[in-house]
């Protein structure tokens, strides 16, 4: 006895997949590949009323048949909230469907898992190194220990030049005759250094 069209439509869903009365939609856990829902590719010109044919669309069914679009039970999946049918699904080279990622630009941070840093990461590293070099090359007034060392070196150089010139002009007699002058000159340089620090 031939089945009524209403019975045929109740056993076959909108996409052409045959449903048994006791069959329930598979519950997929989040993250499972959606290619587990294999569907037949519909043939709109199949026979619509044979006794042995319970689906209007005749197409090969089996685990190797490629799915044309996500099944009708994708709407019942919790993942459907975040996708719109087949518009966000793309097929990779392995044949599985996966979600497309958003096309936002790369973040300004380094990915430590890659060996070669990306161009934004290289620019960010260059910026950080430039800022570090500018911080190290501060003026002498900002770093008192360097300024004191420079002043002491300058005082020593001036003292050596003055002492050598004086000894040369006086034929080695000035240093021996006037040791107080040398000490006073050195004290004058130290007082000038302390005065500049305040």
UniProtKB/Swiss-Prot annotation:
<feature type="region of interest" description="Disordered">
    <location>
        <begin position="1"/>
        <end position="72"/>
    </location>
</feature>
<dbReference type="GO" id="GO:2001244">
    <property type="term" value="P:positive regulation of intrinsic apoptotic signaling pathway"/>
</dbReference>
<feature type="short sequence motif" description="BH3">
    <location>
        <begin position="148"/>
        <end position="162"/>
    </location>
</feature>
<feature type="modified residue" description="Phosphoserine">
    <location>
        <position position="87"/>
    </location>
</feature>
<keyword id="KW-0597">Phosphoprotein</keyword>
<dbReference type="GO" id="GO:0071385">
    <property type="term" value="P:cellular response to glucocorticoid stimulus"/>
</dbReference>
<dbReference type="GO" id="GO:0001701">
    <property type="term" value="P:in utero embryonic development"/>
</dbReference>
<dbReference type="GO" id="GO:0042981">
    <property type="term" value="P:regulation of apoptotic process"/>
</dbReference>
<dbReference type="GO" id="GO:0045787">
    <property type="term" value="P:positive regulation of cell cycle"/>
</dbReference>
<comment type="subunit">
    <text>Forms heterodimers with a number of antiapoptotic Bcl-2 proteins, including MCL1, BCL2, BCL2L1 isoform Bcl-X(L), BCL2A1/BFL-1, BHRF1, and BCL2L2/BCLW. Does not heterodimerize with proapoptotic proteins such as BAD, BOK or BAK. Identified in a complex containing BCL2L11, DYNLL1 and BCL2L1 isoform Bcl-X(L); BH3 integrity is required for BCL2L1-binding. Interacts with YWHAZ. When phosphorylated, interacts with TRIM2; this interaction is associated with ubiquitination and degradation. Interacts with MCL1; may sequester BCL2L11 to prevent its pro-apoptotic activity. Interacts with GIMAP5.</text>
</comment>
<dbReference type="GO" id="GO:0019901">
    <property type="term" value="F:protein kinase binding"/>
</dbReference>
<dbReference type="GO" id="GO:0097141">
    <property type="term" value="C:BIM-BCL-2 complex"/>
</dbReference>
<dbReference type="GO" id="GO:1902263">
    <property type="term" value="P:apoptotic process involved in embryonic digit morphogenesis"/>
</dbReference>
<dbReference type="GO" id="GO:0007283">
    <property type="term" value="P:spermatogenesis"/>
</dbReference>
<keyword id="KW-0472">Membrane</keyword>
<dbReference type="GO" id="GO:1902237">
    <property type="term" value="P:positive regulation of endoplasmic reticulum stress-induced intrinsic apoptotic signaling pathway"/>
</dbReference>
<dbReference type="GO" id="GO:0034976">
    <property type="term" value="P:response to endoplasmic reticulum stress"/>
</dbReference>
<dbReference type="GO" id="GO:0043525">
    <property type="term" value="P:positive regulation of neuron apoptotic process"/>
</dbReference>
<dbReference type="GO" id="GO:0043583">
    <property type="term" value="P:ear development"/>
</dbReference>
<dbReference type="InterPro" id="IPR017288">
    <property type="entry name" value="Bcl-2-like_11"/>
</dbReference>
<dbReference type="GO" id="GO:0070242">
    <property type="term" value="P:thymocyte apoptotic process"/>
</dbReference>
<comment type="function">
    <text>Induces apoptosis and anoikis. Isoform BimL is more potent than isoform BimEL. Isoform Bim-alpha1, isoform Bim-alpha2 and isoform Bim-alpha3 induce apoptosis, although less potent than isoform BimEL, isoform BimL and isoform BimS. Isoform Bim-gamma induces apoptosis. Isoform Bim-alpha3 induces apoptosis possibly through a caspase-mediated pathway. Isoform BimAC and isoform BimABC lack the ability to induce apoptosis.</text>
</comment>
<dbReference type="InterPro" id="IPR015040">
    <property type="entry name" value="Bcl-x_interacting_BH3_dom"/>
</dbReference>
<keyword id="KW-0496">Mitochondrion</keyword>
<dbReference type="GO" id="GO:0005739">
    <property type="term" value="C:mitochondrion"/>
</dbReference>
<dbReference type="GO" id="GO:1902110">
    <property type="term" value="P:positive regulation of mitochondrial membrane permeability involved in apoptotic process"/>
</dbReference>
<dbReference type="GO" id="GO:0009791">
    <property type="term" value="P:post-embryonic development"/>
</dbReference>
<dbReference type="GO" id="GO:0097140">
    <property type="term" value="C:BIM-BCL-xl complex"/>
</dbReference>
<dbReference type="GO" id="GO:0001782">
    <property type="term" value="P:B cell homeostasis"/>
</dbReference>
<protein>
    <recommendedName>
        <fullName>Bcl-2-like protein 11</fullName>
    </recommendedName>
</protein>
<dbReference type="GO" id="GO:1903896">
    <property type="term" value="P:positive regulation of IRE1-mediated unfolded protein response"/>
</dbReference>
<dbReference type="GO" id="GO:0048070">
    <property type="term" value="P:regulation of developmental pigmentation"/>
</dbReference>
<dbReference type="GO" id="GO:0006915">
    <property type="term" value="P:apoptotic process"/>
</dbReference>
<dbReference type="GO" id="GO:0007160">
    <property type="term" value="P:cell-matrix adhesion"/>
</dbReference>
<dbReference type="GO" id="GO:0090200">
    <property type="term" value="P:positive regulation of release of cytochrome c from mitochondria"/>
</dbReference>
<dbReference type="Pfam" id="PF06773">
    <property type="entry name" value="Bim_N"/>
</dbReference>
<dbReference type="GO" id="GO:0008630">
    <property type="term" value="P:intrinsic apoptotic signaling pathway in response to DNA damage"/>
</dbReference>
<dbReference type="Pfam" id="PF08945">
    <property type="entry name" value="Bclx_interact"/>
</dbReference>
<dbReference type="GO" id="GO:0012505">
    <property type="term" value="C:endomembrane system"/>
</dbReference>
<dbReference type="GO" id="GO:0048538">
    <property type="term" value="P:thymus development"/>
</dbReference>
<keyword id="KW-0832">Ubl conjugation</keyword>
<dbReference type="GO" id="GO:0048536">
    <property type="term" value="P:spleen development"/>
</dbReference>
């Amino acid at each position: 006895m031939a089945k009524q069209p209403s019975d045929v439509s109740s056993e076959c869903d909108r996409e052409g997949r045959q449903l048994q009365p006791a069959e329930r939609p598979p519950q997929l856990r989040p993250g499972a590949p959606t290619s587990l829902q294999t569907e037949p590719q519909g043939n709109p010109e199949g026979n619509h009323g044979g006794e042995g044919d319970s689906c209007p669309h005749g197409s090969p069914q089996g685990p190797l048949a490629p799915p044309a679009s996500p099944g009708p039970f994708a709407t019942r999946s919790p993942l459907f909230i975040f996708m719109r049918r087949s518009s966000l699904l793309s097929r990779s080279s392995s044949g599985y469907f996966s979600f497309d990622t958003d096309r936002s630009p790369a973040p300004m941070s380094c990915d430590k898992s890659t060996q070669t840093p990306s161009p934004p990461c290289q620019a960010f590293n260059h910026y950080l190194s430039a800022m570090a070099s500018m911080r190290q090359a501060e003026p002498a007034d900002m770093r008192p220990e360097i300024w004191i060392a420079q002043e002491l070196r300058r005082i020593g150089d001036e003292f050596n030049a003055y002492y050598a010139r004086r000894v040369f002009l006086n034929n080695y007699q000035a240093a021996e005759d006037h040791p107080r002058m040398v000490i006073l000159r050195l004290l004058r340089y130290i007082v000038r250094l302390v005065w500049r620090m305040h």
